[in-house]
Design a protein with these regions (language model features):
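Flexible, charged surface loops at secondary-structure boundaries
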Residues: 1-3, 54-58, 125-126, 169-171, ...
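Short, solvent-exposed amphipathic alpha-helical segments in soluble enzyme
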Residues: 24-28, 79-80, 148-149, 218-221, ...
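A short acidic Gly-Thr/Ser loop motif
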Residues: 66-68, 91, 269
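Catalytic core of DAGKc-family lipid kinases
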Residues: 10, 40, 80-201, 206
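Short, well-ordered alpha-helix to beta-strand connector turns
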Residues: 4, 59, 82, 188-190, ...
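ATP/NTP phosphate-donor binding region
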Residues: 1-65, 72, 76, 80, ...
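ATP/nucleoside-binding phosphotransfer catalytic cores, i.e., glycine-rich phosphate-binding loops
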Residues: 204-275
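Short, glycine/acidic-enriched capping/hinge loops at junctions between secondary-structure elements
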Residues: 19-23, 50, 74-75, 97, ...
Length: 275
């Protein structure tokens, strides 16, 4: 068990169903369990704290109440810090929080702080960055742009980006698994990588019909990947992906858009201080 005396709280009030009332309740919840709230950070307006700033303030715990994308940014920013990160369900999908704590609300999670211990968590490393939950590589990652339009309530943007995403899934540069050489030689419109304790779980998504593209797109919007048409390709300790025509690889890292070079190697690594 870890004893945390002082904490920093990172919130994104615009993430998921977060409300000012929920953020205020969380701010009160830490002191209620004997932890001094030494610093509060509201993203994206405030800058994330550095490891040196946290250490100087005697802060040993960072609690993150935000979506998966903000969580990934904070974890990447704090990589190498000796303190602990508490993951709370503050977004829409909350995949990492669910993996660690189930579907419990943050109040129940906070109540366990006096008995909570840090966990080793597998993550994925590549030249494009670190992902703690999942990676989607290929033109299918463009469906994330549609999801962003849905977040902002921009109907026109949703319509136009949905058309672009469907066209990209149908005719964009597919991605192949080159090391090891597995899966379809013509590649996939989306390859999903998930870190597990036994290896990188690999799934390939290659829709063959318009109906398949619609089904796949809806699955991507919900980040419910397994409900879309896909192939399970096995478990590997590391994997190399390459675009079939040498163009940059479109990416979705923990639900957030990115882009990598024409070839990318992903390998397992550990995050030691998540709770």
């Amino acid at each position: 068990m870890d004893r945390f005396a002082r904490a920093c709280l990172i919130v994104n009030a615009a993430s998921g169903g977060n409300t000012p009332e929920a953020c205020a309740a969380l701010s009160d919840g830490l002191p209620a369990h004997g932890i001094v709230l030494a610093r509060s950070v509201a993203v994206p307006d405030d800058e994330l704290p550095t490891a040196a700033e946290l250490d100087a303030g005697g802060i040993g715990l960072v609690a993150i109440y935000a979506g998966d994308g903000t969580l990934r940014s904070a974890l990447t920013w704090l990589e190498g810090w000796s303190g602990a990160v508490l993951v709370l369900p503050g977004g829409t999908t909350n995949l990492l929080s669910k993996a660690l704590h189930g579907d419990r609300p943050f109040g129940e999670i906070l109540a366990e702080l006096p008995r909570m211990a840090r966990a080793r968590r597998q993550c994925l490393r590549s030249e494009a960055g670190t992902a703690v939950i999942e990676v989607l590589a290929g033109p299918g990652a463009k469906w994330s742009d549609v999801r962003e339009g849905l977040r902002e309530g921009d109907v026109a943007a949703v319509a136009s980006t949905a058309v672009e995403a469907a066209q990209a899934s149908a005719g964009g540069s597919t991605v192949v698994l080159s090391r090891p050489e597995i899966g379809k030689p013509e590649g996939y419109s989306g390859i999903r990588l998930t870190p597990t304790s036994t290896g990188i779980e690999i799934e390939g998504y290659r829709a063959e019909t318009i109906a398949d593209y619609v089904a796949q797109g809806m699955a991507l919007l919900r980040r419910d990947f397994r409900s879309g048409p896909h192939e399970e390709l096995g478990l590997y300790r590391q994997i190399r992906l390459a675009s079939i025509d040498g163009s940059p690889i479109e990416l979705m890292l923990d639900g957030e858009r990115g882009r990598g070079p024409a070839a990318l190697r992903f390998s397992l690594a550990h995050w030691r201080s998540i709770c």
